[in-house]
Amino acid sequence: MGESILPILRKQVEYIYTIKFYKEKMDRAGVRPNDIRTLDDFTQLPFTSPVEMISELKKSPSSNSFYSESVTRINFSPSGKELYPIFHTNNDLERMHKVCSKTLTAAGLKQSDICAVTFGYHLFIAGLFYQGQLEAFGAKVIPLGPGESERAWKVINDYGVSVLISNPSFAVKLASKGLPTIRVLFVGGEPFSSVEGYAEKVREAFGRDITIIDSYSMALCMPVARSCQYESGLHIVDDFVYAEVVDPVTGLPVKPGEKGELVLTHLYKEAAPLLRYRTGDLTVIENKACSCGRSMTLPKGIIGRTDEMVKVKGVKFWPSQIGTILQGFSFATGNYRVVFKTKRGVDFVELFIEGSEYSSEDVEKLEHVLRRDTLVKFNEIIIVEKLELGPRVVDERNTMPS
């Protein structure tokens, strides 16, 4: 994409500068829209944190700088025990459906497909998000909603549903009873691409080689990335959102292929647009051409959270990656504890895993995947039947003698 995206970004920044929330942020940073002449200049714009974004959204409509008379839909998203609104204008919804239609074509959908959506349709956005894009695409849509697996299974089979939109775990539950007409499965709401062997597990439940489409979105930005029928990773929807990957500590861009925090900017959004929004999600972006026509790709989706980074053996390490990795190993319950120590002046890493009925091959594969995905060599991996309650991360390097 390169500098060709710059005119679009500049126009969006000019619009964003008319919003009080962003104008005050940019004025404090000493940056004006006319200062953005290159993509390097764009990185001088201030980041937007989830805390400040949500704080503004929670204000009443009369004092909320993101609310205007052009807003036509208000969904909600949870924040702790509270909710905050998600605003859309008609133009926002139309563009969202338009860019999603391209990804549906890339997924191999046809207008003749009958689709069933099992996500919620009330306050939250997921169900309506899929309903709207599928209708705009021209497919047939059944709004099943969540739960009630017996009724969902019956409707899917009675009406020859060919496309299922579901959490992967719910899809496996339905498939265990038999879903012979499904040819494409859209998964979301749970880690998938980042979990070793999950796709194979799902296909095994269906009993055949169905197409599986994974997506990454967040309530404030839908869509962000989606895989295609070639399953080469999750492609950034780059005609909707501009994605950066930065060092979580310095905020500086990382090199292509390096891990970092995903930062998002809407290209056209009118209501509550994001400007350099720090997602807190750890990922890698690779630029590789795919037969579907897109290139900016998250090869494994989201692989962890950036707010818990530690430096170990000279490597930046995010412990939450361990939990994601363990989901790909059936012998592990998912509970773990990683302990950092110092021995003879160097870092020593112990990993305790709760699990049972494992083989030496299982352990060897786990060691390989951990080293490959985290770049950290664990000195000891100890598997126990029951892990005592306690923190998942224990850093004893500053409390123990060398």
Residue ranges and their predicted role:
Residues 1-98, 102-106, 110, 345-352, ...:
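Nucleotide 5′-phosphate-binding alpha/beta core
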Residues 144, 215-217, 246, 341, ...:
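Conserved beta-strand termini and adjacent loop/short-helix elements that scaffold enzyme active sites
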Residues 194, 198-289:
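Conserved AMP-binding/adenylate-forming
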